[in-house]
UniProtKB/Swiss-Prot annotation:
Its EC number is 3.4.21.92. Belongs to the peptidase S14 family. This is ATP-dependent Clp protease proteolytic subunit. Component of the chloroplastic Clp protease core complex. HAMAP family: ClpP (MF_00444).
Length: 196
């Protein structure tokens, strides 16, 4: 029988009795957010909503985004990144396992000096992909133009967040580049590696 999402007791300030809430809702109240799946519209919208709500609730307390994601869709990932830049609280990004593709883009998007990877975390960068093989010729050309614009945007963000020259990032995005936590730190995707 599946366990489901664990529940934990929570007591609201000023209340005598605790009640049971799922663990993620309890952690959200502490401003701890989680991306533990591929990036898609649903999780993107949930994280955006949480970041906006928590920043309205208190714009002086930092947010912490824990990540273990193989990447996913480009536009939902860019939407998460843009929201991280938009909200007033600093967003710490913490890579716990894998931050690949859009996951590494979001990881790099944390507040500079507040991006962390666990010692055995892995990071992977590459260029955005598309499903050209399904498109007709006219659609193919339009999609290729859009993909080039997205690649340019992603490259510029990595340049800004890592301090690497444009040509280096552009060349590295040509293929899958896997990095250890210390290599990701040297590259500028994270600022710190947690100690074992």
């Amino acid at each position: 029988m599946p366990i489901g999402v664990p529940k934990v007791p929570f007591r609201s300030p000023g209340e005598e009795d605790a009640y049971w809430v799922d663990i993620y809702n309890r952690l959200y109240r502490e401003r701890l957010l989680f991306l533990g799946q591929p990036v898609a519209s649903e999780i993107s919208n949930q994280l955006i909503g949480l970041m906006v709500y928590l920043s309205i609730e208190d714009d002086t307390k930092d947010l912490y985004l824990f990540m273990n994601s193989p990447g996913g869709w480009v536009l939902p990932g860019i939407a998460i990144y843009d929201t991280m830049q938009f909200v007033r609280p600093d967003v710490h990004t913490i890579c716990m396992g894998l931050a690949a593709s859009m996951g590494s883009f979001i990881l790099a998007g944390g507040e500079i000096t507040k991006r962390l990877a666990f010692p055995h975390a892995r990071v992977m960068i590459h260029q955005p992909a598309s499903s050209f093989y399904e498109a007709q010729t006219g659609e193919f050309v339009l999609e290729a133009e859009e993909l080039l614009k997205l690649r340019e945007t992603i490259t510029r963000v990595y340049v800004q967040k890592t301090g690497k020259p444009f040509w280096v990032v552009s060349e590295d995005l040509e293929r899958d580049v896997f990095m250890s936590a210390t290599e990701a730190q040297a590259y500028g995707i994270v600022d710190l590696v947690a100690v074992e």
